[in-house]
């Protein structure tokens, strides 16, 4: 399936400032971009909150070449991970504008201990020309030797930040649907946001699925709860 067909890829932000995150979290990543240098990072948080998106956005902004290895599939095979990392780390990039390449290990908590130990070694072996960004849902599944070699950023959202983030995504979602020429009902969008928050990836995927019927209206929901639209729009 084409990435351009998938809305989560088509509308994935490629700048940190466009990522929907708590201000304090976004400022941390913006600081790395402004320095033009990334540390080794361990990004921890629930599914769909934007960990991989922010990793790619930082690489795009600083002009770093990067690869993504998914820990849930190929990332479970020691030789595959070791060979891909070594091949990427030792190859000269003619297009990168950054001083380091970046290896993104997505869902690193689904890799085996042997793979994580190998990655720990790679972090040290290739520190002169590579940085590593690990994403995980469960930080306790990351071995301590790998954990200790990374700057940890927690994507946990505080209750007082929820309303602002839901409002930002409400605006983002309306923009996507308008560009895709999909009719929608504001109240239904608000209901969907409340239902899937904070899994933005799931929300966009569900909206694309519903949009296949021609419109996102109350007809797609068995029950539409009352939601204060003014709160989302404020």
State each model region's role.
Residues 1-169, 187, 191, 205-208, ...:
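P-loop/Walker A NTP-binding region and its immediately flanking N-terminal helices
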Residues 168-180:
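A short, charged helix-loop
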Residues 178, 187-201, 221, 233:
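A short helix-loop-helix "switch/interaction" segment in the helical subdomain of ASCE P-loop NTPases
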Residues 182, 194-219:
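AAA+ ATPase "lid" subdomain C-terminal helix
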Residues 213-234:
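Loop-to-helix "switch" segment enriched in basic
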